[in-house]
Amino acid sequence: MEQKHRSEFPEKELWDLTALYQDREDFLRAIEKAREDINQFSRDYKGNLHTFEDFEKAFAELEQIYIQMSHIGNYSFMPQTTDYGNEDFANIAQAGMDFETDASVALTFFDDALVAADEEVLDRLGDLPHLTAAIRQAKIKKAHYLGADVEKTLTNLGEVFYSPQDIYTKMRAGDFEMADFEAHGKTYKNSFVTYENFYQNHEDAEVREKSFRSFSEGLRKHQNTAAAAYLAQVKSEKLLADMKGYDSVFDYLLAEQEVDRAMFDRQIDLIMKDFAPVAQRYLKHVAKVNGLEKMTFADWKLDLDSALNPEVSIEDAYDLVMKSVEPLGQEYCQEVARYQEERWVDFAANSGKDSGGYAADPYRVHPYVLMSWTGRLSDVYTLIHEIGHSGQFIFSDNHQSYFNAHMSTYYVEAPSTFNELLLSDYLEHQSDDPRQKRFALAHRLTDTYFHNFITHLLEAAFQRKVYTLIEEGETFGASKLNSIMKEVLTEFWGDAIEIDDDAALTWMRQAHYYMGLYSYTYSAGLVISTAGYLHLKHSETGAEDWLNLLKSGGSKTPLESAMIIGADISTDKPLRDTIQFLSDTVDQIINYSAQLGE
C-alpha cells in the first residue's frame, strides 16, 4: 500500500483547526497576546505572593494564561504530526516550543512562591474546590524543591530534556524506511504505518511473514540511534530523580501520578504471572483454528476468523461509535456526536504522518484526534478509543477548572478503553450466530486487552528492567535492549509464540518510553474501565457513575476517583476480577468454536 500525499485526501478526512486559530498569523498573534499577559502577570505578582488572598487572586489570573497556553501548545504541535516533511508545520511547532519554554521560565516565580508558601496557606488554598489538584501537586513538589535558581535552570532546559523524544519521533516518521517485499509473486509496498495498521493483521501467512521481515530490517538500520536517544532519556530522568532527592527514578516518575511503587509493580507482576497463561491459551486456540503448526511473532496479531474482518468506511464507523456509546445516555452522546460535523478527527493515512494515534485537549474548545484510517475494524477501535479520551476532556473541562481538569496519568486510559468495551459489547449483541459472537469477543481481546494488557504492559516490564539497570549504575546499547525485550517477550509468551531476533526489536516501535512510566497505565486504566463496564452492566446507576467519574477530572486522587464506580484499587481485587473476566471470555470463545466444529 503506497501512501498518498496529504493534498490527495478529501477535506472531510482532515481535521479543521480553525476552531483554535484561523491561520498561522492568527496563531502568532495569540502568542504575542499571551506574552503580554504573562509579562503583566509577572509585574503584578513577582515578589508579591505571600498571603492566601494573594495566591487566590493570582490563581484566577493565571488560569486565563494557562488556557491561552493550552490552545497555543496544542495548535503548535498538531499540524506537524500530520506531516513531518512540511517545513511550515515545523516552523509552527518551533514557534510554539520557543513560546512554551519562555512562558514556563517567566512563570517559574509563581511555582517557586507556591512551594515556598506556609503549609497553612497551602491548606486553605487546597480547600478551594477549583484548586484541589494544583495544591496536591504543589505539596508533592514542595517535598523535593531545589530552590528558585536551580528550578529556573531546569525549566530553561525543558527543550533539551524533550530532545530524545523529538529525535525518536522524527526518526520514526521520516527515517524508518521499509523495503518492498514479495509474496505469492506480487510486490507490496511497506511502511511503518501500513505494517502496524494493516499487514500485521493480514490473513495471508506469507504476507504477514514477509512484511514483518521487511519491517524489522527497516527498524534494525536505526537501532543504534534509537538506543542512544533512549539512553539520553533515562539518564536525564535518573539525574533529575537524584537531584530532587527521590529514593529512585521509579519514585520520581510515579510521584505526579499519585500512586506508589507497589501499585506499579503489582500491575506488572500479576499480569505477567496470572494473565500470561490466559493469553497463551487464546493464542494456541487461534493457531489451532487457523491451522498453524507454530505461531511466530509475525502471527500473534492474526484474527481468529479472518473472513469476518470486514472493511469499514469512515461513515460506517461513525454509526458504530454512536450506537456503541448509547448506554451512556443522551448527555454523553450529544457531546461526542459533534466529532463528525465539526471535523475533530484527522483520518488521512498520508506520507510523513505520525504513525500513532492521540487525542488533544485545547481546554474548552473541543478535542482533536489524530489517526491513520486503513478501513479495518481495528481502526474503529482506535477511533472509539480516542473518542473516549475526547468525551473525558469535554466533561472534565466543562465541570472543572483548568487546574482540576486533567486526570492522573495512572487512570487516564480508563475513559478510552471503556469505550472500546462498549464497541465490543455492541458487536456481540448484534446477532445470535455463534460465529458473530465469537468474532466480537475475539476483538474484545485482541483490539482492547491485548493492546493494553500485553503490548503496553510488556513495554512496562521492559522499562522496569531498563530503569533498574540505570539505578544500578549500568548503561546500555541496542544489543542490550534487544536482549531485554527478547527476555520479556519469552517470559510472557512461553511456548505459545516463537520469539526471534526480529521480535526483539519491538522496543523501537513505541514513543511511550519517552513519557516516563506511562506504558503500565494503559493496563491500570483498563482495570478501572473494566470495573466501570461491569458496573454499567449490573447497576442501574452505572452510566451516571461513569459520567461522574469523567466529570471529576483530576479533582480527586486515583484511589478516590475509582471509588466513584465502586472499585477499590488499593487492593488487587479489581485487577484479579479483570483477569477472571478475560479468562471467562477465552472460555466463551473456545466454546463458540466448539459449536462451529472448530
Residue positions per predicted region:
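Short pre-active-site segment immediately N-terminal to the catalytic Zn-binding motif
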Residues: 309-314, 362-384
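Catalytic zinc-binding patch centered on the HExxH motif and its immediate surroundings
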Residues: 307-312, 345-365
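A well-structured
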Residues: 1-306, 318, 591-598
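Conserved helix-loop functional segments at active or binding sites
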Residues: 323-334, 360, 389, 393-401, ...
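Post-HExxH zinc-binding segment in Zn-dependent metallohydrolases
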Residues: 407-436, 445-447, 451, 525
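C-terminal, non-catalytic "cap/extension" segments appended to globular domains
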Residues: 8-11, 22, 110, 114-115, ...
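Long, K/E/R/D-enriched contiguous segments that form extended
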Residues: 288-327, 333, 392, 439-441, ...
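Active-site recognition of the HExxH zinc-binding catalytic motif
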Residues: 245, 374-394, 416, 421, ...
